[in-house]
UniProtKB/Swiss-Prot annotation:
Disulfides per UniProt: 146-224
Subcellular location: Cell membrane
InterPro entries assigned to the protein according to its UniProt record, in alphabetical order: GPCR_Rhodpsn, GPCR_Rhodpsn_7TM, Pro_rcpt_2, Protea_act_rcpt
Keywords: Cell membrane, Disulfide bond, G-protein coupled receptor, Glycoprotein, Immunity, Inflammatory response, Innate immunity, Lipoprotein, Membrane, Palmitate, Phosphoprotein, Receptor, Signal, Transducer, Transmembrane, Transmembrane helix, Ubl conjugation
Entry-linked PROSITE patterns: G_PROTEIN_RECEP_F1_2
Entry comment on modification after translation: A proteolytic cleavage generates a new N-terminus that functions as a tethered ligand. Activating serine proteases include trypsin, mast cell tryptase, coagulation factors VII and Xa, myeloblastin/PRTN3 and membrane-type serine protease 1/ST14. Proposed subsequent cleavage by serine proteases is leading to receptor deactivation and include neutrophil elastase and cathepsin G. At least in part, implicated proteases are also shown to activate the receptor; the glycosylation status of the receptor is thought to contribute to the difference. N-glycosylated and sialylated.
Function: Receptor for trypsin and trypsin-like enzymes coupled to G proteins. Its function is mediated through the activation of several signaling pathways including phospholipase C (PLC), intracellular calcium, mitogen-activated protein kinase (MAPK), I-kappaB kinase/NF-kappaB and Rho. Can also be transactivated by cleaved F2R/PAR1. Involved in modulation of inflammatory responses and regulation of innate and adaptive immunity, and acts as a sensor for proteolytic enzymes generated during infection. Generally is promoting inflammation.
Further comment found in the protein's record: Synthetic PAR agonist peptides (APs) that mimic the first six amino acids of the newly formed N-terminus activate the native, uncleaved receptor nonenzymatically by binding directly to the corresponding second extracellular loop to mediate signaling.
Major site of localization recorded for this protein: membrane
DNA repair keyword on record: no
Cytoplasmic side of membrane: 100-106, 176-181, 268-275, 346-395
Protein name: Proteinase-activated receptor 2
Length: 395
């Protein structure tokens, strides 16, 4: 269990770094907000007749360095581009395999199909996010699209957490109760999946209610979600994200870790022969890998999110936002890792994915299977006839 421990250690290191950074001050800056807090800019602006001046916000030096630095204008778009290029085709193919190539809709298949759909819906909007960061964190697509982007972004993260939790609990349930009827399990999985989508839809409503765009007059840019008024950050957003972190991350993470630990104990305590032992060791390695990926992708971002808003609420300043957006960006790598997890978990998915990459139709695959089975049968029958002939000759 070294990998999960490493995940928690990584979260602890980020937390210590964040705590240390919040004590630094910027010389000559007396602004209260040290994170991306927007204060209403009431400075006089000289404008010609007929020229409309947009109401804007002012930000401090730290926020300015984040909005104009290489971290947000180079690093973030590079990572998001990689996730988009890898995640779009891989999740699209995964969803196609689950929906149209997999005949037996087991609960695991249902959860993985929903997970692929959540990743696909999120990755589809990445070009807008990439363009936003490349153009100096300047959002030109309007308030409505900004809300949709943010809603899908956070919705995908918590959808992934919940569906991966369902997968872990379902896999443990199958090991403990192997005699439960698959059809009954599939119906339960469909109901749970619909419930998760409805829950995420309700949980993301506040993101559509709060105004997400802010015009920064000094930089002449319009940010999307990166700069919000201080009263919104301290009040609404603090309570909202704290509830999400506890209810939709911490509790599911505890369930996921518990299910996988119990699964490993059950597999280790079961008596098996040598061939089954190899499969058991492979299953345990896969379980540890999936659990480590889960914790590494989602723990730092959710931990730093709570720390960021807590520091704003208690101290009125925070330098954690830069670390948080990096952790949040790296958590999106989960969207392009998930299809490879499907590949190693499911033998059916491996076969269908290989056939899809080789452009084989379902009919062609069936013909190949019939041909191989007939060859095996003919080989067995020929060996039987030859052995019977030799027996006759001996008499």
């Amino acid at each position: 269990m070294r990998s999960p421990s490493a995940a928690w250690l990584l979260g602890g290191v980020l937390l210590l770094a964040a705590s240390g950074s919040c004590n630094r001050t910027v010389p000559g800056n007396k602004s209260k907000g040290r994170s991306l807090i927007g204060n209403v800019d009431n400075s006089p602006v000289v404008a010609g007749r007929g020229v409309t001046v947009k109401p804007g916000f002012s930000v401090d030096e730290f926020s300015t360095s984040v909005l104009t630095g290489k971290l947000t204008t180079v690093f973030l778009p590079v990572v998001y581009t990689i996730v988009f290029v890898v995640g779009l085709p891989s999740n699209g193919m995964a969803l196609w395999v689950f929906l149209f190539r997999t005949k037996k809709k087991h609960p695991a298949v249902i959860y993985m199909a929903n997970l692929a759909l959540a990743d696909l819906l999120s990755v589809t909007w990445f070009p807008l996010k990439i363009a936003y960061h490349i153009h100096g964190n300047n959002w030109i697509y309007g308030e409505s699209l900004c809300k949709v982007l943010i809603g899908f972004f956070y919705g995908n993260m918590y959808c992934s957490i919940l569906f991966m939790t369902c997968l872990s609990v379902q896999r443990y349930w199958v090991i403990v109760n192997p005699m439960v009827h698959p059809k009954k399990q599939a119906n339960i999985a469909i109901g749970v999946s619909l419930g998760i989508w409805l829950l995420i839809l309700l949980l993301t409503i506040p993101l559509y209610v709060v105004k997400q765009t802010s015009y920064i007059r000094a930089l002449n840019i319009t940010t999307c979600h990166d700069v919000l008024p201080e009263e919104v950050l301290v009040g609404d957003m603090f309570n909202y994200f704290l509830s999400l972190a506890i209810g939709v991350f911490l509790f599911p993470a505890f369930l996921t870790a518990s299910a996988y630990v119990l699964m490993i104990r059950t597999l280790q305590s079961s008596a098996m022969d040598e061939s089954s032992g190899k499969k058991r060791r492979r299953a345990i390695k896969l379980i540890v890998t999936v659990l480590a990926m889960y914790l590494i992708c989602f723990t730092p971002s959710n931990l730093l999110l709570v720390v960021h808003y807590f520091l704003i609420k208690t101290r009125g300043q925070s330098h954690v936002y830069a670390l948080y957006i990096v952790a949040l960006c790296l958590s999106t790598l989960n969207s392009c890792i998930d299809p490879f997890v499907y590949y190693f978990i499911s033998q059916d998915f491996r076969d269908h994915a290989k056939n899809a990459l080789l452009c084989r139709s379902v009919r062609t695959v069936k013909r190949m299977q019939v041909s191989l089975s007939s060859k095996k049968f003919s080989g067995k029958s020929s060996s039987y006839s030859s052995s019977s002939t030799s027996v006759k000759g001996s008499y």
